[in-house]
């Protein structure tokens, strides 16, 4: 049976000891989305939206509701391929992790036939067929898991085979600064993702946004109420639609379904989105950045702004800031852009966007194509576009206030005529002064110096300051 997986993934970079607990994380990730009802379990939900369970104490978010036949077992298996640990030890420890989730009312069953299992667990190294989701060797990135298919359950959990996992379930084996990484706690968290549960804002939750080796106690692990409630909503209530699963990293949480920050009272179509951004203060950021770039960023004046691999990137001068969708600045940022991507010396970043398998960085007349951070090639234009962005696998550039489709030119096709887009009001009135366009999951944003506006039916109704929304320096 061929299983088609959602392209949405979640990954786990786990902190091996107590990381500097960014105390406001439980507040920054709470977001509100409208409820959408459906009257039969047979309906497969296809639209993913973000919600926060604000009607009670729950702090979890979920993926699309799963349809299981009554009494159906969720099967799982472990691959022997590349396995450097004792197979029986891995299976036994994994079975104990599934037993914890079983207490929420789900039935799990181990099967030897790996290809027939609903949840398949395997060990991988470095690049393993997933662009943008490579493992990184020993340390940092430990595992990632696929979101279940919409409407049914089929998922994979990959663990980094370069890591050194401990299968011990004794607290004394995880004490000290050089404590090993617990396979049990790692796979327990990833199973939650493979079942469709996103991160929780509750520190006591198994699905909390940072890894920590918890106490095994007397060997009986109790599923926290927050996680049990998530399973109940996902498998037994099926009354809501939920969000995609985030990556889970060592010092931050990264969601693969980006939702740009919006004003608390702002509505788009039939859905009200509230995204609560809380940024680290500049005094807590260690870097050698120039004062001009920092000042411009804090004033909300950007050279380019874009979502790349689910993270929000803001480019100012020779620096770039990288944020997850809970609004947390990634550890170690801002960073010099030239230290991440090999760009021409002294070049100015004008636009950044994802297109096909590439990350494309426009520097004047030149388009630099990267796979990850590896330079592939460049494409040069005679005239430098003012802004460039990608939408629906097409690339558009603004020349003198007019948008042109330049997809074919990036593909180096010859004798291709540039196609003008329809002259909607946005293109006529806004593009000449625009500094960038951001295409997000819930709409399009146009940026000018220090301000941004939401594009609705080709028209920007009003502009708001970037300061305090897309950047917030305290």
Swiss-Prot record:
Protein's UniProt keywords contain Metal-binding: yes
Active-site feature positions: 190
Keywords (A to Z) from UniProt: Hydrolase, Metal-binding, Metalloprotease, Protease, Signal, Zinc, Zymogen
Residue numbers binding Zn(2+): 189, 193, 199
Hemopexin repeat ranges per the UniProt record: 299-344
EC number: 3.4.24.-
Protein name: Putative matrix metalloproteinase
